[in-house]
Regions:
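Intrinsic-disorder/low-complexity regions
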Residues: 1-2, 10, 46, 59, ...
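Short, charged/polar N-terminal "headpieces" of proteins
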Residues: 1-33
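Generic preference for hydrophobic/aromatic residues in regular secondary structure cores
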Residues: 6-9, 46, 54, 105
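Intrinsically disordered, low-complexity segments enriched in small/polar residues
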Residues: 18, 48-52, 99
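Compositionally biased, intrinsically disordered low-complexity regions enriched in proline and serine
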Residues: 21, 53-55, 102
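Low-complexity intrinsically disordered segments
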Residues: 61-108
């Protein structure tokens, strides 16, 4: 798979939450990065910022492209994983199809 420049999957802002999620493909690897700022995060963890990262290896990135079935992987990612529940949907599709993603996160 060719590299794909970064696309925005979520750019949500409300009084209590800001959520920004992007996806890109580098070296055939799908990378999804998110950053949330919330009052709940500050109350739970002492910091309002929460960052998280998902990645699929090359093989599973290709499998995901086939599963989503769109000619344009960019379009398929936007249609399936946009909005506040996009990362949840990504995890569910991966789990239903045996795709192994890596996940990392941190606060602050």
């Amino acid at each position: 798979m060719n590299d794909m420049s970064r696309i925005v999957l979520c750019n949500f802002k409300s009084q209590n939450l800001q959520c920004y999620v992007t996806a890109e493909v580098k070296g055939g690897i799908l990378l999804i990065s998110g950053q949330d700022f919330s009052i709940a995060g500050e109350q739970l963890f002492g910091d309002s910022e929460y960052e998280y990262f998902y990645s699929l290896n090359k093989e599973d990135t290709e499998k995901l492209k086939t599963i989503l079935g769109e000619r344009s992987f960019r379009k398929a990612l936007k249609e399936n994983f946009s909005g506040l529940d996009g990362c949840k949907t990504f995890r569910e599709i991966c789990e239903m199809n045996g795709l192994r993603y890596e996940f990392n996160s941190y606060c602050g």
